[in-house]
């Protein structure tokens, strides 16, 4: 199998294509990207027959910024007969996947696909039963086996394939299903909540998002991101000249500092988290984040980079490379991840975790 489907935000197909072409090429898995604007997906076609499977195995999915999900597929199945769509799909998957742990019948995240989504939901149950009978799926769901994907691009027209359990998005269509909390001050709260789900393994939440931690929110007004930290029982310094929501102030967990986020310097050395969603040029935000990390002012950070209208992949890559260079220069070992989240628009969200550093007073780094 030589094709990989990558799901992305509609309107960002070119960025997704540029990224996969660049990163696959660096691993000598050469190919070309098929792109149609505003379709919400890209197909990367490798020149060598088995390179699609190699790509989803060797390139860490966590290293991709613009892809929400990916899976390797065979040829496009077209003109599926309405009276029996199941038989051709089962035939395509037999011999390709054995004992898959889960079935996902998906579409791209576009308005045009909403009707198709209703069909996918109904179609999943009989298709799952047929795939189990054929040995393509196990008789019970298991997260340790490959996930079988059936991706409809139009009625009667789909790609079939699989993703690897250890190297994909665990979410259907790559989108965590989150509900907006009615007491949150703004919808931006969902960005940070999604980032926590995407970047931090659930079994590490109790340790890395623990009660009683200290956190800083730069550019906090009115408090959408502060809300997520307060909800996890942290003590939060919310830095912004604009006012914070009274509901957050009433918790007693928030200290509002009327300062410019770019000028603020913390006065304590046990800050676990710094978050930042300021509308500013990406280079300026990246430089500020580098300063916080190099000086050991926080252990982990999540921040947003607003994207320009053109060369968006290049802009993000340039800023992440600058951040990595600053950390390397100052002997800071850190893990950097970036993703355009479902709740992001013209922006990407970056997570950095300091693992250890040669900064005095921070011997607790691990």
Swiss-Prot record:
Gene3D superfamilies: 3.30.2300.20, 3.30.70.2810, Vaccinia Virus protein VP39
Main location as per UniProt: cytoplasm
GO function terms (MF aspect): S-adenosylmethionine-dependent methyltransferase activity
Domain of life: Bacteria
Biological process per Gene Ontology, one example term: rRNA processing
Enzyme Commission number, as recorded: 2.1.1.186
Subunit (UniProt): Monomer.
Similarity field: Belongs to the class I-like SAM-binding methyltransferase superfamily. RNA methyltransferase RlmE family. RlmM subfamily.
Name of this protein: Ribosomal RNA large subunit methyltransferase M
Species name: Salmonella arizonae (strain ATCC BAA-731 / CDC346-86 / RSK2980)
């Amino acid at each position: 199998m030589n094709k990989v489907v990558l799901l992305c935000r509609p309107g960002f197909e070119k960025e997704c294509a540029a990224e996969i072409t660049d990163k696959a090429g660096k691993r000598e898995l050469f190919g070309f990207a098929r792109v149609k604007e505003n379709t919400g997906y890209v197909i990367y076609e490798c020149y060598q027959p088995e390179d699609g499977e190699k790509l989803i195995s060797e390139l860490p999915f966590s290293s991709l910024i613009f892809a929400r999900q990916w899976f390797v597929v065979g040829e496009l199945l077209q003109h599926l007969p309405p009276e029996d769509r199941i038989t051709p799909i089962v035939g395509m998957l037999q011999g390709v996947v054995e004992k898959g742990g889960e079935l996902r019948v998906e579409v791209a995240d576009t308005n045009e696909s909403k009707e198709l989504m209703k069909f996918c939901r109904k179609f999943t149950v009989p298709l799952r039963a047929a795939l189990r009978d054929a040995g393509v799926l196990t008789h019970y769901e298991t997260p340790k086996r490959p996930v079988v994907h059936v991706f409809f691009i139009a009625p009667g027209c789909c790609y079939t394939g699989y993703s690897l359990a250890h190297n994909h998005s665990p979410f259907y269509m790559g989108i965590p299903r989150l509900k907006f909390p009615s007491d949150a001050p703004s919808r931006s709260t969902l960005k940070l909540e999604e980032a926590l789900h995407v970047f931090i393994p659930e079994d590490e939440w109790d340790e890395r998002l623990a009660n009683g931690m200290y956190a800083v929110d730069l550019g906090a007004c009115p408090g959408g991101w502060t809300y997520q930290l307060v909800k996890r029982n942290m003590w939060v310094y919310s830095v912004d000249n604009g006012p914070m929501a009274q509901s957050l102030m009433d918790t007693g967990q928030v200290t509002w500092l009327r300062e410019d986020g770019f000028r603020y310097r913390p006065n304590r050395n046990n800050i676990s988290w710094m978050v930042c969603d300021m509308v500013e040029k990406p280079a300026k935000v990246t430089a500020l984040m580098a300063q916080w990390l190099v000086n050991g002012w926080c252990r982990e950070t999540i921040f947003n980079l607003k994207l320009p209208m053109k060369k968006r992949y290049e802009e993000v890559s340039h800023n992440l490379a600058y951040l990595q260079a600053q950390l390397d220069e100052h002997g800071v070992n850190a893990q950097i991840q970036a993703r355009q989240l479902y709740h992001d628009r013209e922006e990407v969200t970056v997570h950095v975790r300091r693992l250890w550093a040669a900064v005095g007073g921070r011997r607790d780094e691990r």
